[in-house]
């Protein structure tokens, strides 16, 4: 809050340095939202030993001096919330250097190559900046060392960046252990007070080694409150209560608990000193994993208690006479010694006064002790406080920096322990002291969200620093808006906000809170009557959000969308939207200048909207089309009819109601004039869905157009070859040119599958590629060039070829490849203007195209999705990862039933089949739960939820316990009077225009009137639900929604038939609907009492859907880095991805999912480059970040843990490596059970390490389980299976069981021989292993025969000498299993290969042509691939790591996530 005022004042005066920077000073609790770590939080990281700052190599991006426009824009935006502090980049500072001149995270090294590639990255990925010379040097600043002198502490020497603000030194001091208790001070240099918002480089007298003094300043009321709040935060710092309660963007991480400290500080462990026994719940064969280990060591998490009570006194506020004596406020404290004190805060500091609970005496106590810091005063009066505070501070500073930074969005926990509810005046004040909390204290008014959101998008974006500033501002304001919208939606449903139309039915009520408009997901005024009623109204906000996302991604200047957040809470769906200026002052009909407010009966158009939407439509593949209005006049539209254009009072052109941005899905619409293909009809399509808003996904349209484009090129090439075969003179040219054209067009599809399939959303964010129209023209030109030596008639023939190809693929234009879609083509009630047959405006052609796209989804995309997952390279782990994978292929979740049918016929896809069934059950149950919750009184919520969970997850007794007095009929609350009815109805009218879309959002306000008399009769309906009735409803819902037959009628039959775990179903359901259950072990088999009771429901939390702003330049660097890695240039890739991380830090701050992906990639690259210690340091941060931003049991977190265990082992932390694998295995089994390909990978890793430690029996159990899974999912002849057999043979030979070992090694040899051939290195190694095992087995048998022949044991029988494997060989095998292979190539080999290539190239090129480096490197890669006989790198054992690191390694990795093929010479 403090900072918001500073920022506002700064903005008003136009102070260039201050705009938006004020956020840095703010304590997290004073902020409406804490998503992006502020500058102070960055310094919090810098101050930590974990994040040592590299000299001057921090990527600090500042805007150039702001001109008047920017100053005005920044003033408008968010009162100081526009930026997330200047680069909260804990990450950028700690990337270890890779080779000389490669800075931490800097692309620009000593050589120019890095910089060139970086510029290329931006140029390649950003069409708008194609001509821009990106000066990365300008983004890197120089370091400066200063001394800071504070009262009562030693002089502190700190390294700072010249681009940091003075404010950031404040935050640094407030975070350091020695000075953290100071909040009210100024910084002086040579007795001159420094401006908080000045950059250090602008201070003339500041030099290397200057001393800055900390000077205590007098308190004001505001500063005193900030100080008390800061003290409370310091005392509560270790308490995880806020993370469990989902407050202030705090979240949990348990890596430190599992590793018992920082991994980097640990020494290597000797194998014989490691405790490696796995917990029972980690060993193979566990039925239901326990719940308690999910949150380890929660008893010791809180830390020591320093005070019993710290609260504001009831004697507040100071009376007039005391104000004149300087009293600001009074505090009440109870120490651990049980002493009670009343404390006065005055301008000089804090002192004990003589007041008691009954008597007010504000005079200082005797002897008086005045302290500028409250901590000093409390330490003086309480020895217990002093000891506890020191312990808290010690533990706080020991925590990793990433554990203390706020996350961008709130992460909620689905299980929480019983938390002690303590006295906390500040928490109470936040809840009740004002309607809105701290926003209200901003001078003037509450925040104007719409103005902030739109102003940030208007910021300049021509240069890289400008784009970074703009994206940072967009991200910060968006994050604040999401937090405010979530808070408002919860307040609406809890009944704490007055409706703007209180006289209407609860379902029809709308709300405005904090300048945000809220509406509920019900069909008010029969708006969606024809489209599916409440069902349509419920899904419309989600489709609208998709529309907002894609229009924001296209980012057309001058076209504006509303800030939109969709929140599901307590069974209701709420849409939160920013408010268009002036919309509340006009009737809806006056507001809309484009589109239709009545689904096409009346239609308007507007030239400016046509211009803007036509630009957007090029990227979104939307076809401009004409419809007839009520006067039968044609009206041109460049969007769907429902899309409305409103010009606000601010002159901006807004579009809203974007629910039909994409074409309809005809497979789920029963239309009279549409005949689906035979294949689709046989599959049961069309299926009549419960609403008519089903549309195709953008990812599908992109894949469809790409598929058609490839077909188009092939057809054109074939026709041209036939044409040119007749022309003898042109034959040679034709054969060279045309296949080249076809290949050229096909290459992008093959080279960039990640872009099209895994990251479709990112595609939108990067600058659009040229349209297919231009591509087609380019191809035609190329064809003409190829035919230039032929007669003019051939040009006509070439054009005919293109025409035929266009006709074959169904292009809208006859002579050009053109694929765009009319979103209104099947909309009921809309009258289209039909163009001539064969033309772009031909309605039949448009309909055919939409039908073809829907058919492509079923016949090509779903099989492609299944085929892709057959390799199990990155298998989905839970419903969320399955959904993301479906969406990346453009497959809607409504096709899940079809996907399950296809998976059910494939035993090798059993795990995915089971995950899909769990997801379909959870989603069906969610639909039922929402209806169930809407008819439940707030009084009975915990009883109703626990009863529902009992019915879902148990078959025991489920009698709901509701006390009789609670069942008495409640009197309806008197809704603010009938005389307001007319006024309220009038107010609601214009607002319907403000959020047409809002009509479609979540469902009803629980406290705001949903439980009034109309609902009372059904308030106890929830008590009638039984397990049998609930599962019958689930079956009906699955059949109705997904057209799939669920063959079970209870949780027991579901478990028996489909292998579902109850704990997995509980987790998935709680996360889906927002329930937090008590962390304890649940007995689901109980026959005597219900499994869940009222007290087991700890909380309900909102499930929030919103748009995630992207960092486009960072994305371009990242994708260019990935391309470099694919080409084998690991160092260049590392540098580019480091730079991407720096840019992400600038935009998002230190904590974000995308930062996590960069860290994981950098750790893997460090490991491949031979720096295992650096890999460990980076991966440790990746694990903490994933736990914090994704969740402690998120699939990404499991992946991070497995990577960290490998790097831990490589660094000699053997025991720690096992603990990390045990954690990963536990989480994986909790989420999806033991029957999963990833479990096989983890079990193989565990087995190997246990084998190295001599725990052979345990090791054998894990490898047997891994082998069983590998056989099931990869087949008998797979390389995974060969490796498992080989590992088992190694373990059994160490146990002396040579016969079994021999049998298993024979299996390995058999697989290698059949897959790789007899001469392959792996086959030869296996044959040698067989020979040794045979020798050992024969020797043992001889000894046994001697014993039998002598009839007794001979005392001198030599023991079997079992040599455990060396750590080096175990690491090699671990690398192999985890997809990393080092192939050693000697320098001599490389020289030989190089000369061969040069010879070969010379024969094929002119004498003057010299092959460039990339050609030779490419050829080298080909040869390396040939040497390995196309062997899958992840399934072969590697030679000595040490040798490869010393020579010139070729690294081939094909892990679960990144595949790398590299040659470095």
Swiss-Prot record:
* InterPro entries assigned: CLU-central, CLU_dom, CLU_N, CLU_prot, GSKIP_dom, GSKIP_dom_sf, TPR-like_helical_dom_sf
Residue ranges, compositional bias (Low complexity):
30-51, 987-1003, 1010-1020
The keyword Cytoplasm appears for this protein: yes
State one molecular function term (GO).
Answer: mRNA binding
Q: What single Pfam family name could you report for this chain, choosing any that match?
A: TPR_10
Entry keywords, A to Z: Cytoplasm, Phosphoprotein, Repeat, TPR repeat
Q: Where is the Clu domain?
A: 427-669
Coiled coil spans:
none
Localisation per UniProt entry: Cytoplasm
Q: Which residues carry this modification: Phosphoserine?
A: 273
Function of the protein: mRNA-binding protein involved in proper cytoplasmic distribution of mitochondria.
What family is reported? Belongs to the CLU family.
Kindly provide the name given to this protein in its UniProt entry: Protein clueless
Q: From what organism does this protein derive? A: Drosophila virilis
Q: Which gene encodes it?
A: clu
